[in-house]
């Protein structure tokens, strides 16, 4: 039940668990549907006979309604058109008998039909692959469905178009013979024209486009479809969200978690730095300003810390000259807002101190060494007064520990467990990979936190006192992983990328890795072998033998997150990039 949209566009649709669509707005428009079968009309709001899953392309949501004789399937996507977007909706009749499809348009306004085009005020609203046989107008969902039920089904299947008095709510009735499909293109943005259905992108085209976006970032390959579905849905959700304004409904979440910074962190951690940069700019520019006193709000301080985090993942050649004026002004306001020395100890200065350190690192990166040195000297004086130099990053609990990050998500989901597992998190998501929170069909806080815990569970990066970067792989390993092959590709690390694969020789895991970075690194796999580490950028090793639980096979064989285990003698351990 994801929120649907495309990159580079502000339109987002809600798709609920029954396949109904909502266009949010001051007066939300809604599209519901029904099937006229041999026995009666079946409407999407009834829900009892409806199931949802992800299509075979691993992206598109597939909704099935059971009627006598088989299923009527629905697929829906938002597709690009002329720099904007339209919604593509398809119904397919898998039964051996003809049916009728009702498309209920609520709050759309009075419609007119001209062959296969439905218009409002002379502008096309819907283009269809078939001509509707009947137009029924009414007042609200219940009145519309009552009128549909009272219409003669045989007339709907055979008669010419008939209608009654126009109103803001209406229903289009289409015939749908067996093994045929009905395609609709719906106007999202008050466009003057709609594309030809025959020339519009297919659902597989849309899926391939999203897969290419995913492949530009970090990839994790396992044999568990649930994990794949939730990962794809979460990444797609935040990529779409990066084009939404900060004040939009998308980011309006009832949560104490900093939703926009979390989303930017997740996008960076998965290699989608362009989308993350775009989102940080919007967040930075949306921060409130106070013209009458020197003060810096929390959002601005978070933005400083996000830019510091961004430097870890961006190219060393990348220029950030367009934020230097903002950095200088923010630092000036931040220093001016600090209390006098005698009051420094009485106030929690953690976020301010961390933000100053972030500003120093950013200025150093941008070759503003004089400013960076001046700021460093002032920071030393402040730290001497408050008597502490240990100030954790505001994002530490989301990025630095798999155990802490999964506890954070568990708390957000109100899961009361002492030792939370990934299986328990995945069980909260529905078959489409999304998770309903309140009135939202998909929750951006969950999307961001989930991506961050999976990143931490498969690859973590920390800075050692020696200056080396420590990279820990397979932090989420437990004994249910014995015999399970995994593969990680294109994981962003400091000034580079890394990939690794684990394959098994009996109960001993073999680790293969390759890190493409100029930074000194130390790689370890503490959950698999506490004593092993390597400073090599490329290598392979056989880690210590794992001792399975005595009851592991009988209890966990069918419920493990990663079900399809690799035989010890199998050569198919996978490769990585």
Question: Model-derived features: where do they sit?
Answer:
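Amphipathic, well-ordered alpha-helical segments in soluble domains
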Residues: 33-34, 59, 279, 299-306, ...
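Substrate-binding groove/exosite segments of carbohydrate-active enzymes
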Residues: 160-166, 209-313, 317-320, 392-426
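Amphipathic alpha-helical scaffolding segments
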Residues: 108, 189, 278-286, 325-329, ...
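The feature captures the catalytic groove of carbohydrate-active enzymes
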Residues: 166-200, 294-298, 321-383, 505-507, ...
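Terminal accessory carbohydrate-recognition/targeting modules of carbohydrate-active enzymes
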Residues: 1-229, 272, 276, 369, ...
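Catalytic cores of carbohydrate-active enzymes
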Residues: 215, 221, 228-231, 264, ...
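The core hydrophobic/aromatic register in alpha-helical repeat solenoids, strongest
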Residues: 132-136, 142, 267, 307, ...
